[in-house]
Amino acid sequence: MRAVRVHKYGGPEVLTLEEIPVPEPKAGEARVKIEAIGVNYIDIYQRTGLYPLKTPFTLGTEGAGIVDAVGPDVTGVKIGDRVGYAMIPGSYAEYVIVPATRLVPIPPNIEARSAAALMLQGITAHYLTHSTYALKKGDTALIHAAAGGAGLLLIQIAKQLGATVIGTVSTEAKAKLAKEAGADHVILYTQADFLAEVKKLTDGRGLDVVYDSVGQTTFDKSLDCLRPRGYLVLFGQSSGPVPPFDPGKLAAKGSLFLTRPSLAHYTLERAELLQRANDIFNWTAAGKLKVRIDKTFPIAEAAEAHRQLEGRKTTGKVILLP
């Protein structure tokens, strides 16, 4: 089968398309013939070695397709089932092996590309808004990278929960998308200081929560945006990792809360995984949640997909097709 492999860490140029054997499922596993692959920032972290993996490895952590083989002792999944998955290595390929308990059934009215676009970022938006900091009516939230795949989903879910949403974006075109998703206010951080704008928009009160996937370049000001006992939810680091800092700053700035959540810990039990995924799929099918697939590339052009994602030339989701 064809797979995009990494033999050494580096830029997009290290991605190589190779022929490797089709894997066989072991006990408790299923093999999925992949129809669509989600591209995520975690793929870039792994490619560059920020999140180191033993080389060589097949990149990718998200996809959707059809079960075409199962190993012994598999229940609840059968050959022919349409399924999605997230946080499973080896997705930039034609086939992937997945523990059967980590597969999510895809409803008939959700196509494979939409499922691949929703599994990681949709479930992330769900747990961030329902569990990490459970948004409620009257809350005011700041969402960085508001026109990205996760950002657009976060806006929509936050509005469903009754929150006032402020988004940050880099261009007028991205501001339009964030507004269309439901953001109450959009700040162009390339033209204005987002901290100063937040203070104006909240009459100096500050925010209940900041959802920050950017990291290094936004971290300090994100903390300064918060009200006393506010929450900074740091769920990514697209601008680089946050340098070490003194936790005493959290007390000095208002007894703030800082958390660095991971999808894996918010879907530990299969029941929780299914609940979150089913909510996302049901909202999408009902038209309450719209997923934006911005660009689609053949798997052979994975490097170009990475260049565009890193270069902030995308909005919504980027998909690869095997």
Task: Indicate residue ranges for each PLM-predicted region.
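Short amphipathic alpha-helix with an adjacent loop that forms part of the alpha/beta core around
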Residues: 194-204
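Glycine-rich phosphate-binding loop and adjacent beta-alpha segment
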Residues: 169, 217-288, 322
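Mid-domain Rossmann-like dinucleotide-binding core that forms the NAD(H)/NADP(H) cofactor-binding site
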Residues: 116-192
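NAD(P)H dinucleotide-binding glycine-rich loop of Rossmann-like/cofactor-binding domains
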Residues: 36, 69, 84-147
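Short glycine-centered segments of the SAM/dcSAM-binding site in methyltransferase folds
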Residues: 82, 140, 164, 230-231, ...
